[in-house]
């Protein structure tokens, strides 16, 4: 099997290349989401795509939803203190860490012991051939119960390869268009 890594990489960022009737399809990333310099010379990442994450981050830094105001506010915080305050407020984000720092972090140590991928056999069955079709996954049926980022990207990539993908979500869960 040969894979053109340029194509594989593009598929993971395909929302940047999508067009609808000739116009670029919007990526719903919030304008204040991003990486900011902190007071201690470190960097802080604020994840603000979901309304509750955005509200928590803005409450902690004490600003309106304005990129310049957030930049100025984050610059008054030490990166680790801001991470802890945002997490305590129910938000998402963190101090940017080096690979060595991540390896020493409790969460980094926890995931380091896990395999990159694990396949769990859930039952016995005879092998089945893939259905015939003009694409590699033609006629394969996929139920997409994912929510953000990697899950929907994988579901879309499966559909691009011919799978019939049905997405199921709940009305109370915030939706981010991709």
Predicted regions and their residues:
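Acyl-CoA thioester-binding alpha/beta core of soluble enzymes
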Residues: 1-175
């Amino acid at each position: 099997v040969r894979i053109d890594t340029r194509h594989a990489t593009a598929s993971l960022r395909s929302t940047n290349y999508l067009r609808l009737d000739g116009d670029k399809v919007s990526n719903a990333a919030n304008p204040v989401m991003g990486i900011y310099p902190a007071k201690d010379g470190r960097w802080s990442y604020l994840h603000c795509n979901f309304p509750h994450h955005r509200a928590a981050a803005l409450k902690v830094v004490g600003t309106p939803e304005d990129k310049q105001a957030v930049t100025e506010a984050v610059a008054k915080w030490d990166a680790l203190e801001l991470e802890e305050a945002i997490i305590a407020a129910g938000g998402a984000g963190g101090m940017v860490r080096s690979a060595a720092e991540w390896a020493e972090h409790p969460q980094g140590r926890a995931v380091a012991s896990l395999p990159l991928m694990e396949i769990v056999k859930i039952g016995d069955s005879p092998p089945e051939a893939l259905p015939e079709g003009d694409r590699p996954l033609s006629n394969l049926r996929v139920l997409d119960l994912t929510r953000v980022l990697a899950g929907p990207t994988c579901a879309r990539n499966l559909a691009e390869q011919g799978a019939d993908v049905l997405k199921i979500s709940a009305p109370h869960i915030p939706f981010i268009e991709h």
